[in-house]
Curated annotation (Swiss-Prot):
This protein's GO CC annotations: HslUV protease complex
Protein name (record): ATP-dependent protease ATPase subunit HslU
GO MF annotation terms: ATP binding; ATP hydrolysis activity; peptidase activity; proteasome-activating activity
UniProt keyword annotation of Cytoplasm present: yes
Classification via InterPro entries: AAA+_ATPase, ATP-dep_Clp_protease_ClpX, ATPase_AAA_core, Clp_ATPase_C, HslU, P-loop_NTPase
One of the GO BP terms on file: protein unfolding
Organism the protein comes from: Persephonella marina (strain DSM 14350 / EX-H1)
Protein location: Cytoplasm
Residues that hold ATP according to the record: 21, 63-68, 261, 326, 398
Family designation: Belongs to the ClpX chaperone family. HslU subfamily.
Top-level division of the source organism's lineage: Bacteria
Residue ranges of the TM segments: none
Oligomer and partners: A double ring-shaped homohexamer of HslV is capped on each side by a ring-shaped HslU homohexamer. The assembly of the HslU/HslV complex is dependent on binding of ATP.
Length: 448
């Protein structure tokens, strides 16, 4: 995916509207933050370094679209993106993940993205080389009496071309061939590191794998699989990994987006007592990363000055002012996301590109079953979702997944026997499947 930094704020919001219902304020904030990056790149170099991104703090209950907005935003512009949970990190000196691993993960995501792009560019060339190698296995070159190679073009060319055509038509896909596959040395580190020290384990694995020589192993596989393996091998040979690493670091530094979820869980609760030392320690460790520092990664040092950080939390038991003042100041843009209503649920079920109703219809269509939800059924599902969220924990749009799974359970199980049928799901069906559960609060808690 190529970087698309030239999108206007309106275009960004329009794209986000295709997947996320409501939350206009949050969409507007991230759209402006993204456009400001494009504006920064248009500035003279001496001024460019002075402009830092305005990090965003999203406040709102679970299931209202906080994570989805950040993920879709990154996907939209082709930027390196990672989501981390603040609760997974501990203060330096305690067992747990080190906050610098956030940037290492971002660099890794950036590297994979750039590598995939570069490999796509050389895909055709790699395919040609892989094809020739497969043909070498299928139509081997003749050997002279004294052991030297000779191609005998006038004899082998017609046969080779015939096999080439058959290969391209897929006629040889199931034939078995033996090919030489490159294999890295087996890691000797796995499973010996204590929990919480995964970063050290990964670094040791990388070190040992780089020291281990590349082995060639002869493997038997189908022509289809051999083409895929050889194409991958050849594509990796055609790209310059140093160039990929350099580009990955540049993108992580200038276009990276880090989404820190559950930031409220490391905020000191307003109990009047002193804040939890470990929680405050995580905040203090996060501070230099968000402020701007340099983190060593296996692809090179990554400066965090221009990475966009989006933090999110429900803040049920704490409030943003419970965060340490220094960290509060690093998230100048505050956006409150609204709880979802019945009308929002109706839209979520039908309007987005990836709407749940569309997903279930497509899944059942693979079995030859045509499912249709009536308007009153959709209204009933939305109403039930709102009721259950009010009665129990409010988990937002995620409640729809639970309810729909319950409704579709029998149809999904019997789908192979329902082939060719047109099934209409109306309000009566919804009420009959969920009525008893909704009336009993105990059942609601456990089943929906």
């Amino acid at each position: 995916m190529q970087l698309r930094e030239d999108l206007t704020p309106k275009q960004i919001v329009e794209e986000l509207d295709k997947y996320i219902v409501g939350q206009k304020e949050a969409k507007k904030a991230v759209a402006i933050a993204l456009r400001n990056r494009w504006r920064r790149h248009k500035l003279p170099e001496d001024l460019r370094d002075e402009v830092i991104p305005k990090n965003i703090l999203m406040i709102g209950p679970t299931g209202v679209g906080k994570t989805e907005i950040a993920r879709r935003l990154a996907s939209l512009v082709g930027a390196p993106f990672i989501k981390v949970e603040a609760t997974k990190f501990t203060e330096v000196g305690y067992v747990g993940r080190d906050v610098e691993s956030i940037i290492r993960e971002l660099a890794e995501a950036s590297f994979k993205m750039v590598k995939a792009e570069k490999m796509e560019k050389v895909r055709e060339k790699a395919k040609e080389i892989a094809e020739e190698k497969i043909l070498d296995y299928l139509v081997p070159m003749r050997v002279k009496r004294y052991g030297t190679l000779e191609t005998f073009e006038e004899e082998t060319s017609p046969a080779r071309e015939k096999f080439r055509q058959m290969l391209r038509n897929g006629e040889l896909d199931e034939r078995t061939v033996e090919i030489d596959v490159e294999e890295k040395g087996v890691s000797v580190v796995g499973g010996v590191i204590a929990p919480g020290l995964e970063d050290i384990e990964n670094q040791l694995k990388d070190l040992f794998s780089s020291l281990a020589p590349t082995k060639r192993k002869r493997r038997k596989m189908t022509v289809r699989e051999a083409m895929r393996v050889l194409e991958q091998q050849e594509a990796e040979k055609l790209i310059d990994m140093d160039e990929v690493a350099s580009e990955a670091v540049y993108r992580a530094e200038n276009f990276g987006i880090v989404f820190i979820d559950e930031i409220d869980k490391v905020a000191g609760k307003s109990t009047g007592s002193s804040p939890d030392v470990s929680r405050e320690g995580v905040q203090r460790d996060l501070l230099p990363i968000v402020e701007g520092t340099t983190v060593s990664t296996k692809y090179g040092p990554v400066k965090t000055d221009h990475i966009l950080f989006i933090a999110a939390g429900a803040f049920h038991l704490s409030k943003p002012s419970d965060l340490i003042p220094e960290l509060q100041g690093r998230f100048p843009i505050r956006v409150e996301l609204q709880p979802l209503t019945k009308d929002d649920f109706v839209k979520i079920l039908t309007q987005p590109k990836n709407a749940l109703i569309k997903q279930y219809k497509a899944l059942m269509a693979t079995e030859g079953v045509d499912i249709e939800f009536t308007d009153d059924a959709i209204e009933a599902i939305a109403e039930i979702a709102e009721q259950v969220n009010e009665k129990t924990e409010n988990i937002g749009a995620r409640r729809l997944h639970t309810i729909l799974e319950r409704i579709m359970e029998d149809y999904s199980f019997e789908a192979p026997d329902l082939k060719g049928q047109h099934i209409i799901i109306d309000e009566k069906v919804i009420r009959s499947k969920l009525g008893d559960i909704i009336q009993s609060e105990d059942l609601t808690r456990y089943i929906l």
